[in-house]
Amino acid sequence: MLRDQQIFDLIIEEQDRQIHGLELIASENFVSDQVMEAAGSVLTNKYAEGYPGKRYYGGCEVVDVIEQIAIDRAKDLFGAEYANVQPHSGSQANTAVFAACLKPGDTILGFDLSHGGHLTHGSPVNFSGKLYNPTFYGVEPETGMLNYDKIQEIATKEQPKLIIAGASAYSRDMDFERFRKIADSVGAILMADISHPAGLIAKGLMNDPIPHCHIITTTTHKTLRGPRGGLIMMGKDFENPWGLKTPKGEIRMMSHVLDMSVFPGNQGGPLEHIIAAKAVAFGEALTDEFFRYAMQVQKNAKAMAAAFVKRDYHIISGGTDNHMMLIDLRNKNISGKEAENALVKAEITVNKNMVPFDDKSPFVTSGIRVGTPAITTRGLLEEDMETIVAFIDKVIMNHTNEEILEEVADAVNEMMGERAIFVF
């Protein structure tokens, strides 16, 4: 068979882009060689509908062992009693939890997308906002932070069946214990979506949802530094609160309800090559080396935020507790879209992002989101954050000057071009 030169040339082009640029998208990271090797292995050939020991296909003896290792490592990493490693993505994990816990039309309470939430937390363009009745909490105009008393007021008024504690562009830690008190006060299931800070949470660097939330979902990339995929967990299994029973008349455990919601409820065959890569990534995350990495991600983010503030950039909430920051650019007279496009020309990748109380459309936005997981994987430290922010500032202040953009691109290439992708 002829090699598909067109595609493989483009793969090399993308590899060169990643090597020579500064990757600051908060949801992106670089995986290790062994994670990539597992993801590209012969396991992609195997169909394995069902769960370990209970498959609908023969020949699953090996993938059963691999999937069970992934499950056990996920439980060890987060201190969970239950883990399902089959969701193809974080969105699929959330879809499965919603289907397990809700009926169409039920009320949910999530973080407003325009304030830092995620599409799957009730956005009207997403399944979560179409199948269910979404209500929202957001940040305070003065502080850019959550006000838990107001969240309680909203929950009391709206009486949601499910509350989602999680975000995609919120730079502060979340009080999961307070969220649980709010959920209990209205009889709601509490789901934490920790897709962004999962790696930091796993190593004890941020508040732990496991003791407080009924169900936890996450992606397996981002700060966990694994393949693109999803994960569902529970700190403790419990009897489903809706009285669903087995054919023998016993109350189904929530673990069984969730498993059934993933397969056959929302997915068919699991991606066993990706599950193997998840297992490898979980194994890496269990090490002391990963703890040092996660700490450095956090240190780099704090150093970067301080450097932005020093240059009169408005960071929503004034700083960061995790791996990211959301920057309101309105005082710099540039839109998020313009900033993103100019930075790409300078070999710096960020994403435009709405900011709370934004007056621009989601396609233009007033802000950018910036994160440190990927550049930390490449070995950059606190002292490098000042240099990076200086690059960004130079681009933003001269975003229409092609000569300066090229000058910054050359400086970025000099900084990153000889540096390995996976260092830390």
UniProtKB/Swiss-Prot annotation:
Q: Which cofactor does it need?
A: pyridoxal 5'-phosphate
Q: Which terms under GO biological process does the entry name?
A: glycine biosynthetic process from serine; tetrahydrofolate interconversion
Keywords, alphabetical: Amino-acid biosynthesis, Cytoplasm, One-carbon metabolism, Pyridoxal phosphate, Transferase
Q: Which Pfam families match?
A: SHMT (PF00464)
Keyword Ion transport: yes or no? no
Look at the named UniProt entry and state the broad enzyme category this protein falls under.
Answer: transferase
Record's keyword annotation contains Transferase: yes
Instruction: Give the binding site residues for (6S)-5,6,7,8-tetrahydrofolate.
Output: 113, 117-119, 361-363
Annotated pathway: One-carbon metabolism; tetrahydrofolate interconversion; Amino-acid biosynthesis; glycine biosynthesis; glycine from L-serine: step 1/1
Q: Which GO terms describe its molecular function?
A: glycine hydroxymethyltransferase activity; pyridoxal phosphate binding
Q: Which CDD domains match?
A: SHMT
The record's InterPro entries line, in alphabetical order, gives: PyrdxlP-dep_Trfase (IPR015424), PyrdxlP-dep_Trfase_major (IPR015421), PyrdxlP-dep_Trfase_small (IPR015422), Ser_HO-MeTrfase (IPR001085), Ser_HO-MeTrfase-like (IPR049943), Ser_HO-MeTrfase_PLP_BS (IPR019798), SHMT-like_dom (IPR039429)
Q: Which Gene3D superfamilies match?
A: Aspartate Aminotransferase, domain 1, Type I PLP-dependent aspartate aminotransferase-like (Major domain)
Location in the cell reads: Cytoplasm
Q: What is its EC number?
A: 2.1.2.1
Listed under catalytic activity are: (6R)-5,10-methylene-5,6,7,8-tetrahydrofolate + glycine + H2O = (6S)-5,6,7,8-tetrahydrofolate + L-serine
Q: What does this protein do?
A: Catalyzes the reversible interconversion of serine and glycine with tetrahydrofolate (THF) serving as the one-carbon carrier. This reaction serves as the major source of one-carbon groups required for the biosynthesis of purines, thymidylate, methionine, and other important biomolecules. Also exhibits THF-independent aldolase activity toward beta-hydroxyamino acids, producing glycine and aldehydes, via a retro-aldol mechanism.
| Name of the featured protein | Serine hydroxymethyltransferase
Q: Which organism is it from?
A: Flavobacterium psychrophilum (strain ATCC 49511 / DSM 21280 / CIP 103535 / JIP02/86)
